[in-house]
Amino acid sequence: MASLNKLSSNEIGNIDRQIAKLKQGQILSEQEVKSLCIKAKEILQDEPNIIQVRAPLTICGDIHGQFHDLIELFQIGGNLPDTNYLFLGDYVDRGSQSVETFSLMLSLKVRYKDRIVLLRGNHENREINKIYGFYDECFRKYGNEIVWKQFTEVFGYLPLSAIVEQQIFCAHGGLSPAMESVDQIKQLNRVQDIPHEGLMCDLLWSDPEETKNGWGISPRGAGWTWGCDITEKFLHSNKLKQIARAHQLVMEGIQKVHNQKTITIFSAPNYCYRCGNQACIVEVDEQLKMNQTQFEPAPRENEPHTTRRVPDYFL
């Protein structure tokens, strides 16, 4: 992950001020967003489609614009650069502060590029986030679509997957019938909108199936479902031990299936401010032992009490 894109002392001061500004609940100016996106693309374009990551680190799932809960996550998991982070995508949409959320994520990436990995989720795509809230939020907060276009350009540079210590395969969604070897991911051109089918699509859209083996048609309309037998074959063929992914709301914030070899991590508590779920982050130590930490939503004024319920199917 080493890069020649080192920050000057002046740039460090500027980005630190931006991080402080965001944590105080203020949005960046259009010019600040433009400069941030340019610098972020310079850093991200040096990263391969598969990031090789060292432990210890903390793995986090979907955030979905829940900015206050992201701040809570860092309070619980530790601030950068003291803690290394791997985020599995879906930073925007659904929540009301996707602008602040992705601005902070990019600012942290620029400031501590070797301490945080940002993978792409299925919502880091124009076709999706123009429908599910990010576009409208950008327009509402800036009065035009310029900032949205700048952010969506960055989405194309986000890596597609990571492997922790050559043993834990990480992607937003999961596996693909088009992938026998993880090396196939290296050949993809990721700087594009997410295709409607194929390996790149499946990495960001697929879901594990608990009760059936083999491949199945996904109810999402993109990606596939895959069974325990597929997980076992994939891990054996690629000399891996586990799969860590996000993409699905799970009420406890974490779910382990396929003989605990496929782990779903979801890091947006009380998803959409109404689902009543817990969130979770997973710390992985040098011996690859996993320690999960579940947490509730950050306190908010005037927020109604929410009962725990499984919602209608979400993209």
Swiss-Prot record:
GO molecular function (one): protein serine/threonine phosphatase activity
Alphabetically ordered keywords of this record: Hydrolase, Manganese, Metal-binding, Methylation, Protein phosphatase
Residues with the Leucine methyl ester modification: 315
One of the GO biological process terms: mitotic cell cycle
Disordered, as annotated region: 294-315
Catalytic activity, as annotated: O-phospho-L-seryl-[protein] + H2O = L-seryl-[protein] + phosphate; O-phospho-L-threonyl-[protein] + H2O = L-threonyl-[protein] + phosphate
InterPro entries referenced in this protein's UniProt entry, alphabetically: Calcineurin-like_PHP_ApaH, Metallo-depent_PP-like, PPA2-like, Ser/Thr-sp_prot-phosphatase
Record carries keyword Metal-binding: yes
Residues of the active site: 123
Names of required cofactors: Mn(2+)
Family annotation (PROSITE patterns): SER_THR_PHOSPHATASE (PS00125)
Bias type Basic and acidic residues, positions: 298-315
Residues that coordinate or bind Mn(2+) 1: 62, 64, 90
Cofactor descriptive note: Binds 2 manganese ions per subunit.
Family: Belongs to the PPP phosphatase family. PP-2A subfamily.
Protein name (Swiss-Prot/TrEMBL): Serine/threonine-protein phosphatase PP2A catalytic subunit 1
GN (gene name): Ppn1
